[in-house]
Amino acid sequence: GSAIRCGESCLLGKCYTPGCTCDRPICKKN
């Protein structure tokens, strides 16, 4: 299985990657 990557920026406080939450300035895995 492929691991979820949570490296997107979330300056607006929202992550679009499933299973990730915003930890400004980037998304982190739940």
Curated annotation (Swiss-Prot):
GO biological process, one term: defense response to bacterium
Record's keyword terms, sorted: Antibiotic, Antimicrobial, Disulfide bond, Knottin, Plant defense
Expression sites (tissue/organ): Expressed in root nodules but not in seed.
Post-translational modification comment from the UniProt entry: Contains 3 disulfide bonds. This is a cyclic peptide.
InterPro entries, per the entry: Cyclotide, Cyclotide_sf
Record location of the Cyclopeptide (Gly-Asn) cross-link: G1-N30
Keyword flag Cell division: no
UniProt xrefs under Pfam families: Cyclotide
PROSITE patterns reported in the protein's UniProt record: CYCLOTIDE
Record-annotated disulphide pairs: C6-C20, C10-C22, C15-C27
Job description of the protein: Probably participates in a plant defense mechanism. Active against Gram-negative bacterium E.coli ATCC 700926 (MIC=0.5 uM) under low-salt conditions. Not active against Gram-positive bacterium S.aureus ATCC 12600 up to a concentration of 100 uM under low-salt conditions. Exhibits immunomodulatory activity but no cytotoxicity in vitro.
Family statement: Belongs to the cyclotide family. Moebius subfamily.
Domain notes: The presence of a 'disulfide through disulfide knot' structurally defines this protein as a knottin.
Name of the protein in its database record: Cliotide T20
Organism: Clitoria ternatea
Lineage: Eukaryota, Viridiplantae, Streptophyta, Embryophyta, Tracheophyta
